[in-house]
């Protein structure tokens, strides 16, 4: 916001005041990942592994069929944004697996 000047007219008329900054509302944190949620999801992923559609999508990503993988995942999860997020997650998993394999050798 513009600096106010003690003027009687114009856009900046009025008394100089400091803006009262309010805390963001609690409802704004919906969907944010907490440490506990991340821990639980990682634990479940470790125990259960990947779903069959995720394994197939990872195979498509391995052979650089990114667009085909996106279309395939979209068909399974329903929306484009969720599909993009899932594809990103699976490609990160593949990258981590490659990194671990390179480190082991």
UniProtKB/Swiss-Prot annotation:
InterPro entries: Ribosomal_eL36, Ribosomal_eL36_sf. GO terms for molecular function: structural constituent of ribosome. GO terms for cellular component: cytosolic large ribosomal subunit. The keyword Ribosomal protein applies. It is found in: Cytoplasm, Cytosol; Cytoplasm. It comes from the Eukaryota. The keyword Cytoplasm applies. Keywords: Cytoplasm, Ribonucleoprotein, Ribosomal protein. GO terms for biological process: cytoplasmic translation. Component of the large ribosomal subunit. PANTHER family: 60S RIBOSOMAL PROTEIN L36 (PTHR10114). Component of the large ribosomal subunit. The ribosome is a large ribonucleoprotein complex responsible for the synthesis of proteins in the cell. Belongs to the eukaryotic ribosomal protein eL36 family. This is Large ribosomal subunit protein eL36. The gene is RPL36.
């Amino acid at each position: 916001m513009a600096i106010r000047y003690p003027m009687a007219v114009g856009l900046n008329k009025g008394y100089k005041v400091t803006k009262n900054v309010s805390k963001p509302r609690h409802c704004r944190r919906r969907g944010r990942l907490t440490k506990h949620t991340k821990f639980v999801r990682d634990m479940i992923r470790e125990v259960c592994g990947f779903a069959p559609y995720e394994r197939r999508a990872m195979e498509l990503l391995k052979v650089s069929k990114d667009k085909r993988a996106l279309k395939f995942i979209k068909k399974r999860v329903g929306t484009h944004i969720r599909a993009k997020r899932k594809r990103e997650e699976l490609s990160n998993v593949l990258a981590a697996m490659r990194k671990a394999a390179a480190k082991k050798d």
